[in-house]
Amino acid sequence: MAARRAFSRNIPALSQRLPLRASRSSFLATMAPNSQSNTAVRRLHATSKHFNAAATSTASSYPTSHEQIKTPEDTPNFLNNKFTASQASTWFDLYDPATNNLVTRVPQSTDAELKAAVDAAEKAFPAWKATSVMSRQQIMFKYVALIRENWDRLAASITLEQGKTVADAKGDVLRGLQVAEGACGIPEQMKGEVLEVAKDMETRTYREPLGVVAAICPFNFPAMIPLWCVPVATMTGNTIVVKPSERDPGAMMILAELAAKAGFPEGVINIIHGAAPTVDFIIDEPRIKAISFVGSNKAGEYIFTRGSANGKRVQANLGAKNHAAIMPDCNKNHALNAIAGAAFGAAGQRCMALSTCVMVGETKDWLPELAERAKGLSINGGFEAGADLGPVISPEAKKRIEGLIASAEEEGATILLDGRGYVPEKYPNGNWVGPTIIANVKPHMRCYTEEIFGPVLVCLNVETTDDAINLINANEYGNGTAIFTRSGPTAARFQSEVEAGQMGINVPIPVPLPMFSFTGNKKSIAGGGASTFYGKPGINFYTQIKTVTSLWRSEDAIETKAKTIMPTHS
């Protein structure tokens, strides 16, 4: 049996310590969501190489355990459909979060390598833009099929580098794959409009690609976020430079390999690596026309402000503090299960994690039962069968999360379930924080005002629906929210009055499917939410409208004097 730690404190109903089960199912270093950098020079392993045995199917060659890699290889750049060893002098060590064993080194790509990526994308753009939409669509069909064939392999990369359970990592891949599948239908949505505006005259509008675009991706969704960007950008005719997180670039490296196999021409998709210098290069490089970013407010606001000042389009999804209002009339069993899953899945490292519960009226008495359900979750290495959640991304993240839990104690909150100090016996060196529930939280406390980005649920008590709505609206973030109720009128009022971009009614994580768009608001998205990911807004972000008015006279002009008045075409 693995080592166990009790997670209950201070609540009479939970005073007897009950163990959790120990078996379980930069700007990117410097400015990723609630993280700190780890920039030690290191020996490494190129994820793409490690997962791609030369003589075997790529879909069946991948790690299935947290066993230490004996000869780690360096992660390369990806330029012109080739993996290219970096000449970097600075490297980022990447460790398995469950063991802190070295997995690979990720380069701070050199200035020459950064420029080479944009050179490749710029060179590829004219031919890719001229490629017919049907040809691009056929490539995307092949890409989707290859992602499905390599689904397990991609998930294994995520588990090894990011720490998610295999099942959760498969979900990461699937939500990105759904966007790629939706992108196959982009030709239908790219159709323009035409109108005969006068005799022999027509006006037509249509969408054109921007050129070279870039994506700066976070650590928490190594497959999904790149797949929010690459399929939509390329299907609309752009070429792209991707900077995956230096914490877990392996999934994107595999996706790049599959893109080349699917038939994407050289230079259409390129990968560079690094932290702040790479981000600054992307922001300041004039040939890059648009930037997609998901990550922390500190990074995103900087990228949005500086990128916009440089004349670029910027879509930036930022931090969150997602609330769920629990009404007394709700289906209690469904609500408690949904809350536990949404709060603690992926160790709380989701921008749509349900991190805050608003307990309305008598529902505050349900918290001991919620804590019991959280104790039943299995915390272990992601490759272990039955794991429900794994480690957090780094020792620095663990330290920060535990510091916020401690601050809640100091400010007078009640630690109903305490996940600090939990260590599975098989993985004593991992970055472990167990599910934590903090009760009696007040709006001024740090655990409420800051995004924790860990397996921590903070709970506030209110008396009425009005109080719940006012509390949620007073929070500066607006990524998502949820309500659990059986009352249609209550849900309708909540839907109308709450200021959040994505809302779930009896749904804890209301992330829209690709036919819609990811529509956070308030401080959770830069620029007031004008540029959102995927769906029609995603297509609009990666394209510009061209309007053409043409005149083809059916008879020769007979007038010899030019007219200087404003034409009205009437």
Task: Give the positions of each predicted feature.
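N-terminal mitochondrial targeting presequence
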Residues: 1-59
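ALDH superfamily catalytic-core signature
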Residues: 298-442, 466, 471, 505, ...
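Residue-level signal for inorganic ion chemistry
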Residues: 100, 136, 158, 180, ...
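Rossmann-like NAD(P) dinucleotide-binding subdomain of oxidoreductase/dehydrogenase enzymes
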Residues: 191-334, 462
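Glycine-rich loop-to-alpha-helix module at the N-terminal edge of alpha/beta enzyme cores
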Residues: 101-190, 200
